[in-house]
């Protein structure tokens, strides 16, 4: 998958993992973190990798949680597909001198459910099946 491809390219890198998912309550969406593990991040180059960048809230919430393991020298956010709204949100959250954003494509909109249009669908569900 996306993460394993990065681990093949950056084969000497340490790796962490976060289990994050969206919780929908009517029109409100929040991000739930169930699990996070990683080595110390102090003064390292940190790549936060996810196939989709929709609202940007998963990236922000995950990064804030990772900071409990130290402060990286540089942050790279990597996504295959992003939305214009998600990119704008991350620009508000992070100063440009602290983060580099890498996206293969930026789609123009989010629909009323905050899914990227046209996007890829729910990557987590497509890769692993529906949440239990």
Positions of predicted regions on the chain:
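PRPP-associated nucleotide enzymes
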Residues: 2-132
């Amino acid at each position: 998958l996306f993460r394993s491809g990065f681990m093949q390219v950056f084969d000497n890198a340490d790796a962490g993992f976060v289990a994050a998912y969206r919780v929908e309550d009517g029109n409100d969406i929040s991000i739930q973190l169930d699990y996070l593990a990683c080595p110390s991040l102090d003064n390292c180059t940190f790549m936060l990798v996810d196939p989709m960048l929709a609202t940007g809230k998963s990236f922000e919430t995950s990064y804030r949680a990772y900071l409990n393991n130290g402060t990286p020298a540089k942050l790279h956010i990597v996504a295959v597909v992003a939305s214009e709204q998600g990119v704008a949100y991350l620009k508000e959250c992070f100063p440009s001198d602290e983060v580099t954003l890498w996206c293969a494509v930026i789609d123009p909109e989010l629909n009323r459910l905050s899914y990227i249009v046209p996007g890829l669908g729910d990557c987590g569900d497509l890769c692993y099946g529906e949440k239990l």
